[in-house]
UniProtKB/Swiss-Prot annotation:
One Gene Ontology molecular-function label: nucleic acid binding
Top-rank taxon: Bacteria
Annotated family: Belongs to the UPF0102 family.
Gene source species: Roseobacter denitrificans (strain ATCC 33942 / OCh 114) (Erythrobacter sp. (strain OCh 114))
Gene3D superfamilies in alphabetical order: 3.40.1350.10
Protein name: UPF0102 protein RD1_1191
InterPro entries recorded: Restrct_endonuc-II-like, tRNA_endonuc-like_dom_sf, UPF0102_YraN-like
Length: 129
């Protein structure tokens, strides 16, 4: 049985989004590394969800949610309250494996990537409030 054209288009769009996401994440990793951070994990998956990037610097664990869109503003709007809760829970799951557990120094950032590939990092951008 052959796929319907609409299904093929959806599969193609999904593949394009996947590769665009990988490219955006690679740009963000380079940006952090240029500021002395050490890359640890990409698309780290826990039981609750996934964290796009995990980096370290001087004992600090940084969890990064990467959002790509036509503009920084549009990218920033793509983070829902449900997604924030999932990111926090997944980050807590990650640090539970650390020697200091939940006492580990950690930060939750958002990295925005626009259509031109420019990167804007918003440190500590996710708040539980």
């Amino acid at each position: 049985m052959t796929q319907m054209p609409q299904t093929n288009a959806r599969v193609h769009a999904g593949r394009m989004a996947y590769h665009a996401g990988l490219s955006a994440e690679a740009s963000v990793i380079r940006e952090y590394e240029s500021h002395g951070y050490v890359f640890e994990a990409q698309r780290w998956r826990g039981q609750v969800g996934e964290i796009d990037l995990v980096l370290r610097k001087s004992g600090l664990v940084v969890f990064v949610e990467v959002k790509k869109s036509k503009s920084f503003e549009r990218a920033a709007l793509r983070i829902s309250p449900t997604q924030k809760r999932r990111i926090f829970a997944t980050g807590e799951e990650f640090v539970a494996q650390e020697p200091q557990g939940l006492l580990t120094d950690m930060r939750f950032d958002v990295a925005l990537v626009d259509a031109a590939g420019a990167v804007q990092i918003l440190e500590n951008a996710l708040s539980e409030g």
